[in-house]
């Protein structure tokens, strides 16, 4: 048989037999050789970049925060008319497409995922006896990468905004030390306003104020009230959705939380289990956070302004009650007798609402509420609200400044 013909036949048979496998070639002297792929270099060429680059989000977050704290003008630009407005409006419009709180669903999903991955990690640590160090290292790396992403998103969503110009400076209010007489006059004025608004409101079977409107309608009123402020305060941008109800509101009450701005979905979430007279002011408070004002005392003050400007009597009453509680607490610290005298002059309806509110929160007193307050206190201090939870009382300085401005001819 011709040798070349023999090699060709053998080659054809070999290729049919090894169809789908690595290609073959004729080597020297017609010897059939199988091409072997070199895996090392190929893997290196196709290797996808790992997740280590996510760790760079830590220094990026710290750098942005440091820049904002060093230059309030940068923070004001970012929050008022810069990237924050575009980012928050875009995400808020998407999350506003659903009637439920996307934030609440995300938190529930996150907790479920955390439990799942924690259990999976524990199982792998038991099974991989010889590779426990590598398994633990990979788990911790993934955890660090996730935390870096969340920190960076938090920085963009609200962290920078904590360092913007104070609201008093932006709106032209002069905050200064006030006398006890001024504080007493403020409390009496707010008490009169609350009495006047309370007279025409609906009440429940226990003669306690009730809204008389469902949540969607109340939420739309809050949205319009905040939007209306843009005419007087252009830096309070409109164009955001309405607040969302929290399904597990009772759980929030156990943590002493009436509402929550969730920075990862740009939603204003409201506890619906609380006394009705607090809900409108809470809605406006959380919507203020959504508009870039993160300091609590400023969000309270803007909430008061929005409620007062609202055409709803229930909203005006809620705003008056919010302001009165803080002002009367400040007066009580300065002069308990004067505070008692103001409280004694309140109408029966207002006193009944205040008593109902106190009774509601009293049932949640305990370790959970204490821990929640402690966590909130540390969070506020970490974001340069040095007085922590006590900084809520600084709203009174803004109220006094507004009172002086309105009395000036």
What are these regions (language model features)?
Residues 99, 279-293, 297-300, 304:
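Active-site recognition of the HExxH zinc-binding catalytic motif
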Residues 294-339:
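Post-HExxH zinc-binding segment in Zn-dependent metallohydrolases
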Residues 61-124:
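Membrane-embedded alpha-helical segments of integral membrane proteins
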Residues 5-8, 17, 25-34:
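Short, positively charged and aromatic/hydrophobic N-terminal segments
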Residues 202-272, 276:
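Auxiliary, metal-adjacent structural segments of Zn-dependent hydrolase domains
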Residues 349-409:
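Pan-zinc metallopeptidase signature
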Residues 115-116, 134-168:
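Transmembrane alpha-helices and immediately adjacent membrane-cytoplasm interface residues
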Residues 159-228:
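Membrane-interface segments at or immediately adjacent to transmembrane helices
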């Amino acid at each position: 048989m011709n040798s070349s013909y023999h090699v060709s036949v053998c080659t054809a048979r070999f290729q049919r037999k090894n169809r789908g496998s690595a290609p073959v070639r004729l080597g020297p002297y017609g010897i059939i050789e199988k091409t072997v792929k070199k895996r090392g270099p190929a893997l290196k060429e196709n290797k996808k970049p790992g997740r280590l680059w996510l760790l760079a989000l830590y220094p990026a977050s710290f750098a942005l925060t440091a820049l904002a704290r060093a230059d309030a003008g940068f923070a004001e630009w970012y929050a008022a008319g810069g990237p924050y407005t575009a980012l928050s409006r875009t995400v808020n419009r998407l999350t506003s497409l659903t009637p439920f709180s996307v934030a609440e669903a995300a938190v529930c999903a996150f907790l479920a995922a955390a439990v799942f991955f924690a259990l999976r990690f524990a199982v792998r640590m038991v099974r991989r006896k010889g590779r426990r160090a590598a398994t633990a290292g990979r788990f911790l790396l993934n955890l660090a990468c996730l935390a870096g992403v969340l920190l960076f998103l938090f920085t963009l969503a609200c962290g920078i905004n904590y360092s913007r110009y104070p609201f008093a400076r932006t709106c032209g209010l002069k905050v200064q030390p006030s006398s006890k007489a001024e504080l007493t006059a403020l409390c009496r004025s707010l008490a009169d306003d609350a009495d006047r608004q309370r007279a025409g409101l609906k009440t429940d079977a226990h003669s306690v104020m009730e809204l008389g409107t469902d949540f969607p309608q109340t939420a739309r009123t809050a949205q319009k009230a905040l939007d209306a402020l843009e005419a007087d305060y252009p830096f309070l941008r409109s164009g955001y959705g309405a607040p969302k109800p929290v399904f597990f509101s009772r759980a929030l009450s156990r943590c002493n939380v009436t509402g929550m701005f969730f920075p990862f979905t740009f939603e204003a979430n409201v506890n619906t289990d609380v006394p009705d007279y607090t809900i409108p002011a809470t809605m406006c408070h959380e919507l203020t956070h959504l508009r870039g004002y993160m300091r609590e005392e400023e969000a309270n003050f803007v909430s008061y302004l929005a409620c007062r400007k609202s055409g709803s009597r229930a909203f005006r009453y809620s705003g008056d009650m919010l302001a009165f509680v803080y002002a009367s607490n400040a007066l009580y610290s300065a002069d308990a007798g004067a505070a008692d005298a103001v409280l004694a002059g309140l109408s029966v309806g207002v006193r009944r609402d205040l008593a109902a509110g106190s009774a509601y929160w009293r049932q949640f007193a305990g370790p959970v509420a204490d821990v929640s307050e402690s966590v909130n206190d540390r969070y506020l201090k970490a974001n340069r609200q040095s007085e922590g939870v006590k900084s809520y009382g600084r709203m009174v300085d803004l109220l006094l400044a507004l009172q002086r401005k309105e009395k000036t001819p």
